[in-house]
């Protein structure tokens, strides 16, 4: 059956700021306390979406979350009105305020893991929400992510959205950022590659930075998504690269159809994995980048592998890259050599995503890939699909509500909370989502 990959990109939230919340993510740590520009950030993301949609790649949007997230502060023992809570936490525990104001839901590669209908035992599209329990600020996301996905993928005859795994370390799940699908045509059955950093009785794990994904979680997600057991491979990421800042597999590898583009040091038993894929995926091609041409540290600094690999109508592939790759002489030299060689990657497109990149999120972090047949695509909430009208409306919405300068101190401003809630209220109507946010359900829009 004919199917296409649709990229659902996360809209950057109104509280996008640099707090260094993500240990193991070196860009996040390096840019801590810098001044951010939320309006520029959301517009950089919108420009990427629109350019790819105009080039013929189906594109949709996933909204940001409510931030600052007052219910989490109430759970932590802060009391009073919303404004009083903001004041108290800013004075007593500013780190908590930064955590509950994180715009990290924009990196929707961590929102869920997706199984196309061609791979599922019941013939439905499955999405399992990620629990993201390695970081407090990300562990807050799952309930609203689930509500948003249910509002986008409403038709239960076509889609199954599963709640996140239990919030325990044993079942740490980071979503599609640790998942690749390889195969031929999108509508044909593929091989799903789940990548983990640790498993309970395996002592091979990183020493410096945490391994966020467990094998136990990957196996549970594969079961929930009803992936045909004959079409699954579980592989461990190289713990040494995790310790060099590769906190998700999509920082060191990206796949599309029959191609796996990765660093030669990406996986723990890479030769074995490559041979497995070669026997199970027709026409499989591994493009392994040698350390002699691009070091792991340069790959992390430029996010070479946090790129999008997209199929064009003629069968060739486009590599969508952050500007940092172009700015690095060695990486850019390698890339120009790559597209000149005999492989499906024949073109590159560079985007300026510096606001997201400074927090450790490149092009691939910002998107959730969902393979859909024409019938399934028609069943998606049409209001989230990118087109000229939506692009214009979202830019006007951003101009109205987003600030062009934000510091950690600004997070305590009760006006920012009100602006955010009003903006999301408008956005849910624009995208026909219903009342997906807690403030809409409790009638707390006025604080």
Curated annotation (Swiss-Prot):
The keyword Hydrolase applies. Pathway: Amino-acid degradation; L-arginine degradation via AST pathway; L-glutamate and succinate from L-arginine: step 2/5. Keywords: Arginine metabolism, Hydrolase. Gene3D superfamilies: Succinylarginine dihydrolase. Its EC number is 3.5.3.23. One of its GO terms (biological process) is arginine catabolic process to succinate. GO terms for molecular function: N-succinylarginine dihydrolase activity. It is an enzyme of class 3 (hydrolase). It comes from the Bacteria. The keyword Ion transport does not apply. The active site is at 174, 248, 365 (nucleophile). Substrate binds at residues 19-28, 110, 137-138, 212, 250, 359. It catalyses: N(2)-succinyl-L-arginine + 2 H2O + 2 H(+) = N(2)-succinyl-L-ornithine + 2 NH4(+) + CO2. Homodimer. Catalyzes the hydrolysis of N(2)-succinylarginine into N(2)-succinylornithine, ammonia and CO(2). Belongs to the succinylarginine dihydrolase family. This is N-succinylarginine dihydrolase. The gene is astB.
